[in-house]
């Protein structure tokens, strides 16, 4: 009898662990039950509505600011980590890995976006891929007083009782705050976060980032590619689940015109195999705002991107700009070509200082695949050969003294 009970419990635990869970609906109930928080939320939603109307009323949708990429300051917090320097170093790398994933997912430069083929898009005739055109960047300057983080260090905190278990902290207002801890689900976020209040996106410790992770923070199972944060940050930028309240009713909508009405999907269903609520339509199971596995979600829609852009416009004045270093920095006479390429490309620019030049290339998981230091001869002009790497998106970090820039390349 004991054996049978133990077996049942193990099966239950395994089954539960296979289903994506998100507590954002519970988070919203807490907000709506607090009169002050509710009014703040409604005020911000009203502002969002104005911004959304502006975008939707533009005759030429390409006039939306697509040429200038907006930088968004991020701070990441590990409340339960001690001060071990090795752990800190590993977690900072894991944080950057997760930031790189966000930047790829929100800008449609993720390598698996190639799965959206003409054959797949034909199944969803009114749906196009969307890009928010933003850059999430770890803050490095003017950190909040008393945090112990010096200028030049990234905004990653360790082992402090950040928020005292709450879900916002005014000390960290002006940032997108990500808290990595035991979340009671894969993660959660308010539906429309407020940087002014220090709102947070909470992520469970075992679904943060990708790869081998760090001690106590190893990405696990079907949610090991960092897409949980893409999902939850979608909520922060005012996106609901594609399946809304998970009912096929006329009133059930995510307020996005190009996501078919549907019920939620889990696991990794074959593309086009899940029927939508409207006859002839299929559920957009590969969308970040569904409940499918990390490996089986890879896109936002153009309608979702417009909605997120409107929300960004509504909160952009709340985001601090003085916490990012070299916001618009670019080396003089900089060129990187060809891009896309087959693994060989040329970099040229005029260095800012007489110091050495370091080139580091990371893959989309944050793995360092190239690292070389060059002597400075007054004009940098080098061809890099990465012919043994597989196709996909890579990030080229170029540093000369305190000057640093990052460029994204696509290897075909």
Which ranges hold each PLM region?
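Stable alpha-helical elements in mature extracytoplasmic
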Residues: 91, 95-98, 225-229, 301-307, ...
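N-terminal zymogen propeptides
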Residues: 18-69, 106
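Sec-dependent signal peptide recognition
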Residues: 2-8, 391
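Hydrophobic h-region of N-terminal signal peptides that target proteins for export
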Residues: 8-17
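C-terminal outer-membrane/trafficking sorting elements
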Residues: 329-337, 341-412
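Fold-level signature of zinc-dependent metallopeptidase catalytic domains
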Residues: 55-106, 181
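Metzincin-family zinc-dependent endopeptidase catalytic domain
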Residues: 97-269
């Amino acid at each position: 009898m004991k054996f049978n009970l133990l077996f049942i419990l193990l099966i239950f635990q395994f089954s539960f662990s296979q289903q994506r869970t998100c507590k954002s609906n519970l988070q919203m109930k807490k907000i709506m039950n607090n009169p002050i928080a509710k009014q703040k939320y409604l005020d911000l939603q009203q502002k969002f509505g104005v911004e959304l109307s502006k975008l939707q009323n533009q005759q030429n949708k390409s006039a939306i600011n697509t040429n200038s990429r907006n930088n968004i300051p991020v701070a990441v917090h590990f409340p339960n980590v001690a001060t071990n320097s090795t752990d800190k170093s590993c977690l900072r790398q894991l944080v950057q890995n997760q930031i790189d994933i966000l930047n790829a997912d929100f800008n449609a430069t993720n390598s698996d976006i190639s799965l959206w083929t003409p054959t797949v898009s034909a199944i969803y005739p009114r749906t196009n891929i969307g890009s928010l055109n933003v850059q999430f960047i770890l803050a490095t300057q003017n950190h909040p007083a008393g945090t112990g983080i010096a200028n030049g260090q990234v905004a990653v905190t360790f082992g402090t009782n950040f928020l005292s278990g709450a879900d916002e902290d005014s000390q960290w207002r002006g940032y997108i705050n990500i808290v990595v801890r035991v979340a009671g689900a894969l993660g959660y976020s308010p539906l429309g976060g407020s940087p002014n209040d220090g709102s947070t996106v909470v992520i469970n410790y075992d679904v943060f980032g990708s790869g081998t992770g760090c001690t106590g923070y190893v990405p696990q199972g079907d949610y090991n590619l960092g897409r949980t944060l893409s999902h939850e940050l979608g909520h922060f930028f005012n996106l609901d689940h594609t399946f809304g309240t998970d009912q096929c009713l006329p009133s059930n909508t995510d307020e996005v015109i190009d996501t078919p009405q549907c019920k939620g999907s889990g696991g990794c269903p074959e593309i086009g195999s899940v029927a939508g609520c409207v006859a002839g339509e299929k559920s957009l199971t590969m969308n970040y705002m569904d409940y499918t596995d990390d490996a089986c979600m890879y896109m936002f829609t153009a309608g979702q991107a417009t909605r997120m852009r409107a929300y960004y416009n509504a909160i952009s004045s709340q985001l601090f700009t003085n916490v990012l270093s070299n916001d618009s920095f670019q080396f003089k006479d900089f060129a990187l070509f060809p891009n896309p390429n087959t693994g060989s490309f040329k970099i040229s620019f005029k260095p800012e200082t007489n110091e050495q030049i370091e080139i580091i290339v990371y893959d989309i998981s944050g793995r360092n695949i190239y690292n070389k230091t060059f002597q400075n001869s007054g004009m940098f002009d080098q061809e890099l050969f990465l012919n043994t790497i597989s196709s996909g998106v890579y990030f080229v970090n170029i540093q000369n003294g305190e000057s640093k820039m990052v460029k994204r390349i696509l290897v075909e």
